[in-house]
């Protein structure tokens, strides 16, 4: 057997996709393959694609075309491979393999088969696989932070969303498995663990018969990691038990990522959101009272088919009233294969864009005000990078999640991957600026 080929991975899409990328890297390294970050030097490039909305697919296609033009042997993995396997093979002769979301753990045998000249298609119709703490993993995040998947797939069928088709139904890992992986991450020096799944508040429902997020948080609270953050918490799943676990577990950050999508009950019904009209003022106020100082992030979809100006105004007033810390806004993307694709009264893109801009313009002064409230405080900051030109450190406080929220720009010296006290001296609508607090 000659020398094994070198492999690069181009990662696109969400942090769930990132974990798949990290497991593929871990499996390849364990099998003796060279992994290179430089795609030009690699024999094979694995493109872990995203297919969530049109813009994500366009980015995936651009990447694939660029690599094809460079005559690279391409292995297509991820959601787009799951979604469009036949078209991809037809249109990209450079693709030596297409691997679905439930099959990436077989990546080593895929490369071996491709090396023998086979064109490999490995796409399970219904993905059922989920990696655990025994699956090799090679992290690609900054050294202080790691994502930890507690479950994969989704049992809900929201009208606009194709994820259940791409990722399968929910399958949770056991509490023991998650704790074991968390301990491995802490041993690697991780300071912040971010729990992810499609619906984190439904964690455990499929294997325990009821959600077990509160028990999971308490179990993770016994691990020596400074920060545990949750993403994708449905407000209706934030039960008194879960809220108590957040309050009583010191290393669980009071950061709630609530994918609300809209405020108007009729729009929520059209979206087939699981709580229908129960997203209301009471739920948000209850959370604020139960967890004082909670940082609230949410996302909204504007321009859902049939959304009236009055319904959009309802959303504007809702955002104005509740003053979320962070808001992400997407315009509706009609996805073939979803019920919303065929709904009447699809809105023109310019109307959707204008509504997105109005909502973001409303949120900006709120975000600015929230950040101004941090000025003068000394806050804990996880230092993640150093700007090579200015020497400034860049990190995040507990208010900010990676990639989606702001950052803290810090003067002073500190070791990367550590959490240090920083005195905040100024802020804009996105970021904070501060100085390392010396211990003299």
UniProtKB/Swiss-Prot annotation:
<feature type="binding site">
    <location>
        <position position="158"/>
    </location>
    <ligand>
        <name>[4Fe-4S] cluster 2</name>
    </ligand>
</feature>
<dbReference type="InterPro" id="IPR005840">
    <property type="entry name" value="Ribosomal_uS12_MeSTrfase_RimO"/>
</dbReference>
<keyword id="KW-0963">Cytoplasm</keyword>
<dbReference type="GO" id="GO:0005829">
    <property type="term" value="C:cytosol"/>
</dbReference>
<dbReference type="GO" id="GO:0046872">
    <property type="term" value="F:metal ion binding"/>
</dbReference>
<feature type="binding site">
    <location>
        <position position="154"/>
    </location>
    <ligand>
        <name>[4Fe-4S] cluster 2</name>
    </ligand>
</feature>
<comment type="similarity">
    <text>Belongs to the methylthiotransferase family. RimO subfamily.</text>
</comment>
<dbReference type="InterPro" id="IPR012340">
    <property type="entry name" value="NA-bd_OB-fold"/>
</dbReference>
<comment type="function">
    <text>Catalyzes the methylthiolation of an aspartic acid residue of ribosomal protein uS12.</text>
</comment>
<dbReference type="Pfam" id="PF04055">
    <property type="entry name" value="Radical_SAM"/>
</dbReference>
<feature type="domain" description="Radical SAM core">
    <location>
        <begin position="140"/>
        <end position="370"/>
    </location>
</feature>
<dbReference type="InterPro" id="IPR002792">
    <property type="entry name" value="TRAM_dom"/>
</dbReference>
<dbReference type="InterPro" id="IPR023404">
    <property type="entry name" value="rSAM_horseshoe"/>
</dbReference>
<dbReference type="InterPro" id="IPR007197">
    <property type="entry name" value="rSAM"/>
</dbReference>
<dbReference type="InterPro" id="IPR020612">
    <property type="entry name" value="Methylthiotransferase_CS"/>
</dbReference>
<dbReference type="InterPro" id="IPR005839">
    <property type="entry name" value="Methylthiotransferase"/>
</dbReference>
<feature type="binding site">
    <location>
        <position position="14"/>
    </location>
    <ligand>
        <name>[4Fe-4S] cluster 1</name>
    </ligand>
</feature>
<dbReference type="GO" id="GO:0103039">
    <property type="term" value="F:protein methylthiotransferase activity"/>
</dbReference>
<feature type="domain" description="MTTase N-terminal">
    <location>
        <begin position="5"/>
        <end position="116"/>
    </location>
</feature>
<protein>
    <recommendedName>
        <fullName>Ribosomal protein uS12 methylthiotransferase RimO</fullName>
        <ecNumber>2.8.4.4</ecNumber>
    </recommendedName>
</protein>
<keyword id="KW-0411">Iron-sulfur</keyword>
<feature type="binding site">
    <location>
        <position position="79"/>
    </location>
    <ligand>
        <name>[4Fe-4S] cluster 1</name>
    </ligand>
</feature>
<keyword id="KW-0949">S-adenosyl-L-methionine</keyword>
<dbReference type="GO" id="GO:0035599">
    <property type="term" value="F:aspartic acid methylthiotransferase activity"/>
</dbReference>
<feature type="binding site">
    <location>
        <position position="161"/>
    </location>
    <ligand>
        <name>[4Fe-4S] cluster 2</name>
    </ligand>
</feature>
<keyword id="KW-0808">Transferase</keyword>
<feature type="domain" description="TRAM">
    <location>
        <begin position="372"/>
        <end position="438"/>
    </location>
</feature>
<dbReference type="GO" id="GO:0051539">
    <property type="term" value="F:4 iron, 4 sulfur cluster binding"/>
</dbReference>
<dbReference type="GO" id="GO:0006400">
    <property type="term" value="P:tRNA modification"/>
</dbReference>
<feature type="binding site">
    <location>
        <position position="50"/>
    </location>
    <ligand>
        <name>[4Fe-4S] cluster 1</name>
    </ligand>
</feature>
<dbReference type="InterPro" id="IPR006638">
    <property type="entry name" value="Elp3/MiaA/NifB-like_rSAM"/>
</dbReference>
<keyword id="KW-0408">Iron</keyword>
<dbReference type="InterPro" id="IPR013848">
    <property type="entry name" value="Methylthiotransferase_N"/>
</dbReference>
<dbReference type="Pfam" id="PF18693">
    <property type="entry name" value="TRAM_2"/>
</dbReference>
<keyword id="KW-0479">Metal-binding</keyword>
<keyword id="KW-0004">4Fe-4S</keyword>
<dbReference type="Pfam" id="PF00919">
    <property type="entry name" value="UPF0004"/>
</dbReference>
<dbReference type="InterPro" id="IPR038135">
    <property type="entry name" value="Methylthiotransferase_N_sf"/>
</dbReference>
């Amino acid at each position: 057997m000659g020398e094994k080929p070198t492999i690069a991975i181009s990662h696109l899409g969400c942090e769930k996709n990132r974990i798949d990328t990290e497991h593929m890297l871990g499996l390849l390294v364990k099998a003796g393959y060279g992994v290179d970050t430089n795609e030009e030097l690699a024999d094979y490039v694995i493109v872990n694609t995203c297919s969530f909305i049109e813009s994500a697919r366009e980015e995936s296609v651009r990447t694939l075309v660029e690599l094809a033009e460079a005559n690279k042997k391409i292995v297509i993995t991820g959601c787009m491979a799951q979604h469009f396997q036949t078209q991809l093979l037809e249109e990209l002769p450079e693709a030596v393999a297409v691997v679905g979301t439930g099959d990436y753990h077989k990546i080593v045998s895929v490369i071996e088969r491709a090396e023998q000249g086979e064109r490999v298609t490995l796409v399970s119709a219904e993905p059922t696989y989920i990696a655990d703490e025994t699956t090799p993993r090679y992290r690609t995040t900054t050294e202080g932070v790691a994502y930890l998947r507690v479950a994969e797939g989704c049992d809900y069928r929201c009208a606009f969303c194709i994820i259940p088709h791409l990722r399968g139904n929910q399958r949770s890992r056991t509490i023991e498995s998650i704790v074991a992986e968390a301990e491995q991450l802490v041993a690697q020096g991780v300071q912040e663990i971010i729990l992810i799944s499609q619906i984190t508040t439904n964690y455990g429902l499929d294997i325990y018969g009821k959600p077990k997020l509160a028990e999971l948080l308490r179990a993770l609270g016994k691990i020596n990691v400074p920060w545990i953050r949750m993403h994708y918490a449905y407000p209706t799943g934030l039960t008194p038990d879960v809220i108590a676990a957040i309050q009583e577990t010191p290393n669980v950050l009071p950061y709630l990522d609530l994918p609300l999508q809209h405020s108007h009950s009729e729009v929520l019904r059209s979206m087939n959101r699981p709580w229908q009209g129960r997203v209301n003022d009471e739920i948000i106020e209850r959370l604020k009272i139960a967890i004082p100082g909670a940082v609230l992030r949410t996302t909204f979809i504007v321009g859902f088919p049939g959304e009236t100006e009055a319904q959009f105004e309802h959303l504007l007033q809702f955002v104005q009233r509740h003053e979320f810390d962070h808001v992400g806004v997407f315009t509706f993307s009609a996805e073939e294969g979803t019920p919303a694709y065929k709904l009447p009264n699809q809105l023109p893109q310019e109307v959707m864009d204008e509504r997105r801009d109005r909502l973001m313009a409303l949120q900006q002064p709120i975000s600015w005000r929230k950040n101004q409230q941090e000025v003068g405080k000394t806050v804990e900051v996880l230092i993640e990078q150093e700007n090579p030109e200015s020497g400034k450190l860049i990190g995040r406080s507990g208010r900010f999640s990676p990639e989606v929220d702001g950052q803290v720009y810090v003067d002073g010296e500190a070791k990367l991957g550590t959490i240090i006290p920083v005195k905040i001296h100024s802020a804009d609508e996105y970021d904070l600026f501060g100085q390392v607090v010396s211990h003299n």
